[in-house]
Amino acid sequence: MECYLDNSATTKPCKAAVDAEISALTELYGNPSSLHQKGVDAYMLLEKSRGTIAASLKASPDEIYFTPCGTVSNNTAIFGAVGAKKRLGKKIVTTALEHPSVEKCMERLEESGFEVVRGQPQSDGHISLKDFENAIDENTILVSVMAVNNEVGSVMPTENLKKIIKSKNSPALLHVDDVQGYMKIPLCPKNCGIDLMSVSAHKVHGPKGVGALYINKNVRINPYILGGGQENNMCSGTQGMPAIAGFAC
């Protein structure tokens, strides 16, 4: 008998997720942007799913934006935040342990002239909050960290980061990549002062090909993927309703 032990990389979709996907594929296959009945039915499913994901984060439905995956959520958060805040500073604070979907963004921003400061891990894999206290200043426009590390399992005390940002009179937005910790370790973005938070379905027995980005309703970032204006202009492209339905089942 096979024993699958790689659930930190991905999980087997549960039966409810598979059934929800099949139903959306075979019955609710309309484009949620269409005005005819099939489109309206798909739109209703979309918004019901948005409410479900919002409830899991103790957020409002209008703070949840569906994306094709956690990587797109991270890219959208980082480039969107920097685009909106770049007139206020050129410094970004992160860690040396981030997922490639964050680290590669940082490398691109460095090439564009931004300063990126990376907190270094201690022997136990944790990043000292002192690193953030020393790095964050009035020129910092974004702090981006992983809530739970996907390789060493260290947990970032995200609830303390916003306090540090405020104590430094910094305009920085706080982005948390919670793809690994979502639905495993409780994390309420509002209670922790998180402005942007990325999650994904395939780590929690949902389908691959869908993620979500929480954006606090008082925060404005620039759209990253341009096109037809779906997801309130934040992530254009026809929504993948089967995957979204499986995510929110």
Predicted regions and their residues:
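Pyridoxal 5′-phosphate
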Residues: 1-249
